[in-house]
């Protein structure tokens, strides 16, 4: 891990310019805030991290808050930049694909990457936050302040006013830079949206989520194959399960609030599960299912879009404070961590010139952030419904085939989002031209149509790729036939 450094010395950026360390106030000590503290602390800046809750390292887990996260390439890079990637991967559980459960209990495996076998990692939220805070605490120039709730701010002057939720003591602070990492209901963003002509939208979906748990088997093992994200897609609703280090599974039920509200007693709950998730009753356990379902209420899901992310040369929002998204692409944390990487790159480029760093961050990130917010919303439709349709499975086979033949040119959407650092907006642009090609092929439904892909791809591939395409396409056509469920 990177070692702590003395913030009293001048720092040098990648352009060779020396600069005095900044006083930075980070509001929000969750995942993104604590990682940003490490990024800026490593560069020698004086960082004060303010969190309204008590220290998560000594607090009990909050009911209703997901303890699972899917770590992929963008998040891994941001962790690697502060020397923590290996520690988190060693603790995480690799998931190589989705395992789909039908209503009869039969399962089908859909790999994330059938060609190169890349995977995402299930990591515990609390563990990850603890690792980040422990690492931050080792820097003498990073200072952690818990039970500090922001109540007002003068973002033009860099002044903050906070209150201790327990003692009600009022505290103030001043900083050269204020960064809001305080989540979807950001107090820093509330100050920013007061500005005239500020773009802001907030969208709640009609679905909520409620968490359940699958315990280990009597022998202390996982109750299901643990290297997969398990999904029970049911059209208008779905259930997913991610593995934990203690051999339990965090199960999340997503469905319309009207449906949650219609399940008012034990009998209705068990009837609902017998009809839609019969195999899950045995996995969860009847008594545990009833207890966990009724002990808490379904939680809302919100998408936030706004721009710009900065105010002058004094304030910035990142992570969920800037672009909260529904959790169906597993990119919320990864996008927030990527914010840290992008911001650090700008510090490397411009030193401490916040008048250049902050506007450029806003300009670089807003389009990509809006793109992944929209993509996450669409992916809910895919996960709960489309994954069971033959047209979707055929499309995925075509994606895999072309990715195998042209790995540097044809990259499936999921791969570009989860396993690369391509801009989110570019990922969607690539998908658009791929869709045009595949639509022609799917409507053609013949070997000749598949062979025609070579011509349609001409503008996107080199002659070497075309040569491989023409020699392999006929021999691999059998891959396009949909397979029966296992």
UniProtKB/Swiss-Prot annotation:
The chain crosses the membrane at residues 401-424, 437-459. GO terms for biological process: 'de novo' NAD biosynthetic process from L-tryptophan; anthranilate metabolic process; kynurenine metabolic process; L-tryptophan catabolic process; NAD metabolic process; quinolinate biosynthetic process. Keywords: FAD, Flavoprotein, Membrane, Mitochondrion, Monooxygenase, NADP, Oxidoreductase, Pyridine nucleotide biosynthesis, Transmembrane, Transmembrane helix. It catalyses: L-kynurenine + NADPH + O2 + H(+) = 3-hydroxy-L-kynurenine + NADP(+) + H2O. One of its GO terms (cellular component) is mitochondrial outer membrane. It is found in: Mitochondrion; Membrane. Pathway: Cofactor biosynthesis; NAD(+) biosynthesis; quinolinate from L-kynurenine: step 1/3. One of its GO terms (molecular function) is kynurenine 3-monooxygenase activity. Its EC number is 1.14.13.9. It is a multi-pass membrane protein. Pfam families: FAD_binding_3. Its cofactor is FAD. InterPro entries: FAD-bd, FAD/NAD-bd_sf, Kynurenine_monooxygenase. Catalyzes the hydroxylation of L-kynurenine (L-Kyn) to form 3-hydroxy-L-kynurenine (L-3OHKyn). Required for synthesis of quinolinic acid. Belongs to the aromatic-ring hydroxylase family. KMO subfamily. This is Kynurenine 3-monooxygenase. It comes from Anopheles gambiae. The lineage of its organism: Eukaryota, Metazoa, Ecdysozoa, Arthropoda, Hexapoda. The gene is kh.
